[in-house]
Each structure stands twice: as C-alpha cells, then as structure tokens.
Regions:
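Conserved C-terminal structural/oligomerization subdomain of aldehyde/semialdehyde dehydrogenase
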Residues: 29-35, 219, 256, 309, ...
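Long amphipathic alpha-helix in the N-terminal Rossmann-like dinucleotide-binding domain
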Residues: 49, 71-82, 96-121
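Short, well-ordered beta-strand elements within core beta-sheets of diverse protein domains
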Residues: 32-39, 54-60, 145, 255-257, ...
C-alpha cells in the first residue's frame, strides 16, 4: 500500500499535526491501495501562514520569472507524463488509454495554453490616450483551491497554473478519494523549483479542510469545483470574510438532435455521455430527439450503448471503467431504479453488474426512453453512464425543455442548418454550447450559468479570476 500521509507545506513534505489516516480505494476492486492523512485546522493554518508569507515576495516577481518556472514545470510534466496517467487510472478507475490520452493530456494542454496566454497578457495599461488614468492588474493574494475527483489533473491545472501565473500563492486540497495525482503534481512543482510557500497541499475532506479553507480569514479567494450542494456551503463559509469565490458546479446537459443532424449524431452523443463513465459535469445526459426521427434514434442509441464495453482500468482499449466510489455507485443505482419506478422505459443497461465483473463499482451504459422532464432521471445530476431520451416536435419546445433545469453548464445541439444552430445556441442558457460534436479549444472560457456556478476557467478569463483591478489617477 502506498504511504502518502504527508502534506506539502512551505517547500517540504511534512507530517500532519494530528494523525488521521484515510484509505484510498481502487474502484476497480474495492480494495485500498494507498493511505493519506486527513488534515486538521492546524494543518490548514500552517499552509495558509506559509502561503501568506510567500505572497509578500512572490507578488513582486516579474512575468518573465513566472514564465520561466511554468516552462520548467511543463518540462517536468512531460517527463513524468506516464506517472500521472498511472496515478489517475489507479485512483479513479479510468482505463489507461483514457487516463493517458485524455485525462493526463488535458492537464498538459491547460498548462501550455496558460503559458501562451501569460506571454501576451499585460498587467498594466493606460486607460486611453485622452486620460491620465492607468490600470493595474494585481494578484488577489492567497488562494484556496479545492478540486474534484472526476477530472483531477484537468481541474488542478485550471486552478493552480493561473494562480502561479498571476503572482498568487495557494493551498490546494485535492479530492480525498482521488488525491494521488495532486500529490504527484506537487512533486513536479517542487522539482521545477518554485519558491517555498508559493504552493502548498493539504489533503482532507470537505467538512474539515474544505471548511477551514473557505472560511479562513487569511485566504483571499476560493476556487472550487464539485457538487452544487457543496458549492452552496463554500459560498456561505466565504461570505463571512467577503472573499472572492469561483465555482464550477453540477450540470444537466441537454443534447438537441434535430431531424437534419449529421449521420452519426446520435451515436456520437452516446459515446460522449458514456465517456469517463458518465462522470463529467457537462455530460449531455438528456438527449432530445425530433419526433420524426425518434424511433430510428432510439434504435441507434441502444445499439451504440450495447457496443460500449465495461472493463478493468488496467486494460488497454476504448472501454469505460467503474465509477469512483460506493457512494456514487449507490446514488446512480438508486436513480436508475427511480427511472424504472416512475414509468420510463429501460431500453439498455440497468442496475445489474456487467457480465464478468462481480467486484468493483461498474455500471452498464444505461438508456431510458419515454422520459418526461418531470422525472428524477431528467432533473437530477446522475454522474454516471445514464442517458434519458426525450422526444420533441418544435425548436421552441426543445429549447424550453433543455432550459427547464436549475443548471446551466454545457448544452449540445446537432443540425446541419448553420442558421438554426446559431439561433438555438443563443437561446440555450449555459456557459458552453457544443455544435455538431465540436469540442472546446484550450484557452476558451469554461463555466456555468445559474446553479452550475460562477466565474470562468481557462485562457485569459482564467487568469483574470485571480486578479484585482486597480485604477491610478494623475498618471501623466
């Protein structure tokens, strides 16, 4: 078993103030493979003190100094790329090909894109030619970064790298059920030579370290990715000290498939929602299909879902692995059973374990038809390989169904009518709209409307989240 009990504070791996062991479970076999420590208020205080002290000098570094360190970090990441993939595969059950080509690659892509954006970013500028006002963009200060288990290094890179780039210092709390990738990233940061105290890592759960971070008076900003329920608690805790809060929360993405969609739109939609075992906050979990092609679409969807293999993470291939934990597994199975009891038609998959997999948190790719938007499976975030198919007749009806949710992270639409695509995209209430299977480029903004959060991650928008804006008059 891996011994990962230490925290990274002030440039050193240190023992926790109080012993509080926590076993990390391999979701493929339900066995513990590592032990970490859950931090205390005292551990958090030490990390915050370290970051606060380091901020006094780190904030004065030049853009060129920070770029040099980030470029070194990129080189270290490239060198240890396969280690990161192995860590992600082990901690969250991601098949090795997916862990390597998608999960680990996304962290490198974000790191390199932030380096590019930083090179072109201006930290001060004159207001305009007729004004004697000058604008400064300054680091907000000490940041508390709380990241999830479903896209571990992706989210760590989206928070840690822009904080570095803008001159902030930080405390990272990765998910306690998938912490190994975050600890490996801390090793990379140390190897790259970042000054002591600029980056600190304390493991812990949400009720402990998460609460200490979000309520700490010496933390100036919290960036959190996770559930909407937890996001509400983060916001309440942060309100006492009026700290900035950036939230990327849950979603219930709609995927509108019009009759004039491209040939493989339905099959691609199935592959999309089932990827990462359905554990993506912007997954297109509601497929809305125009009635004239509904029967054909259902047949294609069921056929494609039945083709998707479920297997061990250690195997190579394009299969999906387990979901992350027993808690998530039980929640997903409960929602599948609710779909059956509420009258939806189970067209593929179901609550039983896949053939040949008698241990682990494996779930079959599951499809429901005859779904109404009032059912739990259509309203609640499932976070597993489960899709609801809903028919519609008109464009306005489809838009209304998609927008009939408290979420607003990512929505999708499929049509070969470019004018229609643009028109519908403007009507959808979400931070991202994906047309005809096209993904978002690195450096574009990612974030949600309504209860999917606030703020944006990625690119220039991601840098700006960590900056204060100062106006200076009488400049000239």
């Amino acid at each position: 078993m891996l011994d990962k009990r230490k925290f990274y504070i002030n440039g050193q791996w240190v023992d926790p103030v109080k012993k509080n062991d926590f076993e990390v479970i391999n979701p493929c076999n339900e066995d513990p493979f590592a032990v970490i420590s859950l931090g205390s208020k005292e551990d958090t205080d030490l990390a915050v003190k370290s970051a606060k002290n380091a901020f006094e000098t780190w904030k004065e570094t030049s853009k060129e100094e920070r770029l040099s360190l980030l470029e070194k970090l990129s080189s270290v990441y490239k060198k240890r790329f396969n280690e990161m993939a192995e860590a992600i595969s082990l901690e969250m059950g991601a098949p090795m090909d997916w862990a390597t080509d998608v999960q680990t690659a996304s962290g490198k892509d974000h790191l390199d894109d932030f380096i590019l954006r930083l090179k072109n970013f201006k930290f001060d500028e004159h207001f305009d030619n007729k004004s004697n006002n000058h604008i400064y963009y300054e680091p907000i200060g000490v940041c508390g970064l709380i990241t999830p288990w479903n896209w571990p290094i992706n989210q760590i890179a989206l928070k840690v790298v822009p904080a570095f780039a803008t001159g902030c210092t930080m405390i990272l709390k990765p998910s306690e059920i998938a912490p190994i990738s975050g600890m490996l990233f801390a090793e990379m940061i140390d190897e790259a030579g970042f000054p002591k105290g600029v980056f600190n890592l304390v493991n812990g759960d949400g009720a402990g370290v998460g609460t200490h971070i979000s309520s700490h008076p010496d933390i100036d900003m919290v960036s959190f990715t996770g559930s909407t329920r937890a996001g509400r608690l983060i916001s309440k805790n942060a309100a006492e000290t009026i700290k900035r809060v950036c939230l990327e929360l849950g979603g219930k993405g709609g995927n509108i498939v019009f009759a004039d969609s491209y040939k493989d739109a339905v099959r691609d939609g199935i592959r999309n929602v089932m990827s990462n075992s359905g554990q993506s906050c912007d997954a297109p979990t509601r497929m809305l299909v125009e009635k004239s092609i509904y029967e054909r679409a259902v047949k294609e969807a069921v056929d494609e879902a039945n083709k998707i293999k479920v297997d061990q993470a250690s195997k190579k291939g394009d299969h999906i692995g387990p979901v992350i934990s027993k808690i998530q597994y039980d929640k997903i199975i409960d929602l599948i059973e609710s779909g059956i009891s509420e009258g939806a038609t189970l067209a593929a998959g179901g609550p039983e374990l896949p053939n040949g997999l008698n241990k682990g948190y494996f779930i079959k790719p599951t499809i429901f038809t005859d779904v109404t938007n009032e059912m739990r499976i259509a309203k609640e975030e499932i976070f597993g390989p489960v899709l609801s198919i809903i028919p519609f007749e008109t464009e306005d009806e489809a838009v209304n169904i998609v927008n009939d949710t408290s979420y607003g992270l990512g929505n999708y639409l499929q049509t070969e009518d470019r004018e229609k695509a643009h028109r519908v995209a403007k009507k959808l209430r979400s931070g991202c709209v994906y047309i005809n299977g096209n993904g978002a480029d690195a450096g574009t903004p990612f974030g949600g409307y309504r209860q999917s959060g606030n703020g944006r991650e990625g690119g220039v928008w991601g840098l700006e989240e960590y900056l204060e804006v100062k106006n200076v008059t009488g400049w000239s």
